[in-house]
């Protein structure tokens, strides 16, 4: 009987998962549009989502060319605490980057004044460093310092975690951003300044039983989405998980066999690379095939630069199918057409990223809302299954 009890306790310990609920909020793009500021923003900022991927690292100056404008369309956010006692921050859980940073009290930029700011003097566990960090984007850069403190993430106390404290955040548009900072969940190889990413630090301290995390993004307007650290909850998906090898341990990069519509190949005819990225809201790919897709679904550009379709046409549009590791993953029009306040916007965006392996696609939230996703660091693979 004692052995049975012990085995039961061991099994229970292996099933412990830490869940961080994600709240779906109005995107920065939508807020700017409602305030009549979007056109001016788009004029001043040359939006190029490609800058987020494969940046040119400059180690001596610790420069990371990761444009914050990439988060213009983000809608899913979670809360973390930093310090003792914890100071709360709303962050993007981003599998397309690796650093953690939040605004600090040292930041007097307009963008910082409307957000929570970390105060090191209010934390008994904060440790300062002499290191600085700069994230370059658009017309300026976010500059700051690096420090160490305890980070509370979904019930996990991640001690001695390095993170960035911003001192300047250019661009008044960030004043309206629905998030305070970014929590990166990609591999440490792309971390600016060599900072240990949050999940790596959590795993290294033995705080989770499995070296993986998983993501469920609900289509619900406000709640239901979650990041699960250290486990997989099968109630979020149907069928079984299909596993796809990571091809490059930097981003969560995988191979796509082909992309088809109505049974015909429309892109990626000889295979291509794709990054599974919770920090990108849309499905992005090379401008030429994306332009063809936009044409095929009847999308045209409006005055805000969005590609829109007739809402009445959605029911007649075809699925777009991504074949990955031999398994088909259809994305229906109800997923790739985003409906907002009477407008129906295409969830596809053109982006050219030169890579040694050819064209690159980004499977953002439009895709992840359809497929429960497991990011398995232990086996360097991504698991996908239809959401429940």
From Swiss-Prot:
List of residues that carry Phosphoserine: 130
Highest taxon, organism lineage: Eukaryota
Active site positions: 94, 277
Subcellular location field: Secreted
Residues in Peptidase A1 domain copies: 76-385
One GO process term, biological-process aspect: proteolysis
Keywords tagged on the record: Aspartyl protease, Digestion, Disulfide bond, Hydrolase, Phosphoprotein, Protease, Secreted, Signal, Zymogen
Gene Ontology molecular function: aspartic-type endopeptidase activity
Residues spanning the signal sequence: 1-15
Disulfide bond residue pairs: 107-112, 268-272, 311-344
Gene3D superfamilies named in the record: 6.10.140.60, Acid Proteases
Primary localisation category: secreted
Reaction equations catalysed: Preferential cleavage: hydrophobic, preferably aromatic, residues in P1 and P1' positions. Cleaves 1-Phe-|-Val-2, 4-Gln-|-His-5, 13-Glu-|-Ala-14, 14-Ala-|-Leu-15, 15-Leu-|-Tyr-16, 16-Tyr-|-Leu-17, 23-Gly-|-Phe-24, 24-Phe-|-Phe-25 and 25-Phe-|-Tyr-26 bonds in the B chain of insulin
Similarity annotation: Belongs to the peptidase A1 family.
Function: Shows particularly broad specificity; although bonds involving phenylalanine and leucine are preferred, many others are also cleaved to some extent.
Official protein name in the record: Pepsin A-5
Biological source species: Homo sapiens (Human)
Originating gene: PGA5
């Amino acid at each position: 009987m004692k052995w049975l009890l012990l085995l039961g306790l061991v099994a229970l310990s292996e099933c412990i998962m830490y869940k961080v609920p994600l709240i779906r909020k109005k995107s920065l793009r939508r807020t700017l549009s409602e305030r009549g500021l979007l056109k001016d923003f788009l004029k001043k900022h040359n939006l190029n989502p490609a800058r987020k991927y494969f940046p040119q690292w400059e180690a001596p100056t610790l420069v990371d060319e990761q444009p914050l404008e990439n988060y213009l369309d983000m809608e899913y956010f979670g809360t973390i605490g930093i310090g003792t006692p914890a100071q709360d921050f709303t962050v993007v859980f981003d599998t397309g980057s690796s650093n953690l940073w939040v605004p600090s009290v040292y930041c007097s930029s307009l963008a910082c004044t409307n957000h929570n700011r970390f105060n090191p003097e209010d934390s008994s566990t904060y440790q300062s460093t002499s290191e600085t960090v700069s994230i370059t984007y658009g017309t300026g850069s976010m500059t700051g310092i690096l420090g160490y403190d305890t980070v509370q993430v979904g019930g996990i106390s991640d001690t001695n975690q390095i993170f960035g404290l911003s001192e300047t955040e250019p661009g008044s548009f960030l004043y309206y951003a629905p998030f305070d900072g970014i929590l990166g969940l990609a591999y440490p190889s792309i971390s600016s300044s060599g900072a240990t990413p949050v999940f790596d630090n959590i795993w290294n301290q033995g705080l989770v039983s499995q070296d993986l995390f998983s993501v469920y993004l609900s289509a619900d307007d406000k709640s239901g989405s979650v990041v699960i650290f250290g486990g997989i909850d099968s109630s979020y998906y149907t069928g079984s998980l299909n596993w796809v090898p990571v091809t490059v341990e930097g981003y969560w990069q995988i191979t796509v066999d082909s992309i088809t519509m109505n049974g015909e190949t429309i892109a990626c005819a000889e295979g291509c690379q794709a990054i599974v990225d919770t920090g990108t809201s849309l499905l992005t790919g090379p401008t030429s095939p994306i332009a063809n897709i936009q044409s095929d679904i009847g999308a045209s550009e409006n005055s805000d630069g969005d590609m829109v379709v007739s809402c009445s046409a959605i029911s007649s549009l075809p699925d777009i199918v991504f074949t990955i590791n031999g398994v088909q993953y259809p994305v229906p029009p109800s997923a790739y057409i985003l409906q907002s306040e009477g407008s129906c916007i295409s969830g596809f965006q053109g982006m050219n990223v030169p890579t040694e392996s050819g064209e690159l696609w980004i499977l953002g939230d439009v895709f992840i809302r359809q497929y429960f996703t497991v990011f398995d660091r232990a086996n360097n693979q991504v698991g996908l299954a239809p959401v429940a």
